[in-house]
Structure formats: C-alpha cells, structure tokens
Amino acid sequence: MKSSKTGILLANLGTPDTPSPKAISRYLKEFLSDPRVVDLPRWKWLPLLNGIILPIRSRRIAKNYGAIWTEQGSPLFAITQKQKALLTEFFQQRQQNVIIEIGMTYGNPSMQYAIDNLIEQKVDKIIVLPLYPQYSSTTTAPVFDVFAQALKRHRHIVPFEFIHSYHLDENYIEALVKSIKVRLKNDEFLLFSFHGIPKRYEQEGDFYRPQCEQTAQAVVQKLGLKKEQWRLCFQSRFGSEPWLQPYTDKFLETAAQQGITKLAVICPGFSADCLETLEEIKEENKRIFLAYGGESYHYIPALNDSPEHIACLGNLLLKRMTI
C-alpha cells in the first residue's frame, strides 16, 4: 500500500531580496499594496504609496536592513531556512513522508513557487502553516489569499488544511516560558511587545488583541509573575490613524518614571527574528528606554530555530498529518 505524501507549506511575511533601496522598494510595494494590510481606497492610497512613501521609506530603512543582513540573506529568510531543515529532520526521525517548502506572502520564495513545487511532487495533502501564532487579518488572512490564488493555476486542488493560529498551543507556551526563564533576571520587568494593527481593524472584527493577551497571560501564569512585573504593548505602528495601545515606544518613555529601570522585552508574535525585532526592538527601543532614565535593557530573541520551537511546530503539524 502506497504511503501518503504530505506537503507542508511554511508561510511567513517575506523579505527584500537584498538590502538595497531598489529591492526594498519592490518588496514594500507588494506588501503595502495588499488591501488586507492597508485598506484605504486604492485611488487615495496607491498614489501616496508610489509617489511619497516608497521613495522615502525604502532609502531610509536600507541602512537598517544592511545592519542586520547576513551572508545567508535577511535574518527572517535565513532562520526560516533553518526551520525547514530542522523540521525535515524531525519528520524523517518519525518516518513521515513529508516535503516542506517555504512560501512568502510577499517577495521570494513566492507562495506560487512553493505550491507549484509541492504539486509537482504529487503530494496527497498540503498543510499550510502560517508562522504567526496569533491570527490577524493583516498577516494570517493574506497567507490564505495568496495560497488560494496560487492554486488557481492547477486543475486539481489538492486536499489541504490551513492552521488558523496556535496562540495557546501547549508546546508554544512552554517554549516561550523556557526561553524567558533562562534569560530573565529576578529584578527585571518583562515586556511583551506584539506587532500592532490599526485600532479600526479590531473594531471591524479582527480578534488579534485577545489572542495576544491570552498568550501573555498563559506565559506569565506559568512564570508566576505578578501583574506589576510585566506589561503587554504593541509596536511598529505606521501611518496617522490610531493603532492598538499601549504603544511599546511610548511605554518605554515613561517606564522609568513608574520605577521600571531594568527591563527585558520579548516579541512572542514573531516566529523568526527580523527587522522589527532586531532593529526596532533590540536597538532603537533600547536607546529610547535608556534615554528616558532606564538602566538596563535587553531583548529576548524570537524562538527561531531553537529545539523547543522546532518541537512545537513539528508536533503542531504532526497532529494534522492523517488524511
């Protein structure tokens, strides 16, 4: 009897091909043109994006990308490649017939490329794993959109399963707890920083915030932290309309006034370190905190390719392996 072959799609946001302004502009154009990300009327948004935002922003952040770039490419891409390799080993050790592809919602390797490869290798089922523990209409939903679009090229739609979120997955919570325990000092305040979304999106039905809160609550409960020992904030706001609050940078400006002078920050919504964690949180926000009276600040890395994270993702997928 022929054993079934499962295709696994590891989906993440994406990254520029190089840290050059041209490549960054090309990537940002694809990303910020998605109505799931910015839902303003096209006639209003696209001229603003193409005429002002892309020329200015791509040049401005090229230096930031250059500072974190590695020989393997962007950190997000390099780490996702490691996750793929380690997950392949995970399934080989369990004698599972699995093919894993990486598909980015924006940029390369594209979702289309990943799907075409899986179907060409005649997989019997595809499991789509968006590498976002907390669901958002700005991240998880675009994965579904692009995945569905990629299937349009094929006459036969392979049976598939789409993992919606895993914000309370036991292995995910335990991986966060272990990572924090080995890095958090007794006298440090713990800040959970999640990527923000416009407040309006929440009002329109995006339930991202409750999932972020549930993740943080589950972690602090296992850590035994009191309410005055931690806080949840939202980072990376963009544009002029209100986003989810409290804002990470604004909290850091006032933390010392509240008696918080030693701080560690973790970003549980990121499955791999990237520009927002390595530059914004680790470097830029550290400067803010210290400038406003903070004494010590350090960033707790994303789960990345840690053994606990690979076990978390592997077991999450293993549960869905049967057709």
Swiss-Prot record:
Report whether Cytoplasm shows up as a keyword of the record.
Answer: yes
Which SUPFAM superfamilies does this UniProt record tie to the protein? Chelatase
What does the record list as GO biological process? heme biosynthetic process
GO CC terms: cytoplasm
Gene3D superfamilies, alphabetized: 3.40.50.1400
Q: Which UniProt keywords apply?
A: Cytoplasm, Heme biosynthesis, Iron, Lyase, Metal-binding, Porphyrin biosynthesis
Which Pfam families is this protein grouped with?
Ferrochelatase (PF00762)
The entry's Fe cation-binding residues are H195, E276
Enzyme class name: lyase
Localization per Swiss-Prot or TrEMBL? Cytoplasm
Recorded GO MF terms: ferrochelatase activity; metal ion binding
State which pathway it belongs to: Porphyrin-containing compound metabolism; protoheme biosynthesis; protoheme from protoporphyrin-IX: step 1/1
What EC number(s) has UniProt assigned to this enzyme?
4.98.1.1
| Catalytic activity as recorded in UniProt | heme b + 2 H(+) = protoporphyrin IX + Fe(2+)
Asked if the record carries the keyword Cytoplasm, the reply is yes
Stored HAMAP family: Ferrochelatase
Role of this protein = Catalyzes the ferrous insertion into protoporphyrin IX.
Q: Which PANTHER family match?
A: FERROCHELATASE (PTHR11108), FERROCHELATASE, MITOCHONDRIAL (PTHR11108:SF1)
State the similarity comment: Belongs to the ferrochelatase family.
What's the protein name?
Ferrochelatase
Q: Which organism is it from?
A: Mannheimia succiniciproducens (strain KCTC 0769BP / MBEL55E)
Q: Which gene encodes it?
A: hemH
